[in-house]
Amino acid sequence: MANTAQAKKRVRQTATRRERNFGLRSKLRTAIKGVRKAVAAGDKNVAEVVFRKAVSVIDSVASKGIIHKNKASRHKSRLSGAVKAMG
């Protein structure tokens, strides 16, 4: 257990950051699933709208350092390809 005041503060900060990161990561996964679901349903208009929202979430999470920028680019590229392949 943390003994010094600094160590106790670091424990508190880590817990706060962990909760925040968990929520943002969850939002990211939900956004990606939404695009995948729209693509599977075959509705291109809905897929494009959901894709734009997902890109916003992906960029937001990447800018906060939750995921690496290359991983964000990979997600966006694959989702974009799936939406464009709909026809």
Swiss-Prot record:
It holds the Pfam family Ribosomal_S20p. Signal peptide: none annotated. GO terms for biological process: translation. Keywords: Ribonucleoprotein, Ribosomal protein, RNA-binding, rRNA-binding. GO terms for cellular component: cytosol; small ribosomal subunit. Transmembrane segments: none annotated. InterPro entries: Ribosomal_bS20, Ribosomal_bS20_sf. One of its GO terms (molecular function) is small ribosomal subunit rRNA binding. NCBIfam families: S20. Belongs to the bacterial ribosomal protein bS20 family. Binds directly to 16S ribosomal RNA. This is Small ribosomal subunit protein bS20. The gene is rpsT.
